[in-house]
């Protein structure tokens, strides 16, 4: 995992003492909220198996969830719900969830590393890191917390709405999901293709 710390070490060398990684889960699905996490790991800490959550199996993500939280100096997890997504759009709602997650951190970071190429909606000192979840340990840790938390939420929704089989796809578009969604559910997304 040392390669996961290379970029962060360069940032620490600039004089920063406390940085966090921020990532989200749920920007692509057709259903459910967007979930963001912010994590401050101790500098240079290696967590065996830590990587971009998309590269890990569900079982490996679940196995990393508690160790990441236990090892972190601080962590925060927050949602932007469907009504906020519809009001703000998915990017605005992602920023909202990220800001909420960063606000939970104590101590507060001096710099937030945001996965992706946009940070205009972040209310804190921040930098974008494209593919940050596979390049930065703090962002990789945040990606695991966000993905596991959102998946668990969608499992709860599966119990309330069994007709959508959220336990199988977590709200991401599948043929079964498209078939279960009627035109009356599409308010903000008028065109649905499959």
Kindly label every feature range from the protein language model.
Residues 1-187:
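RNase H-like, Mg2+-dependent phosphodiesterase core
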Residues 188-194:
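A short, hydrophobic C-terminal helix/tail in secreted or cell-surface proteins
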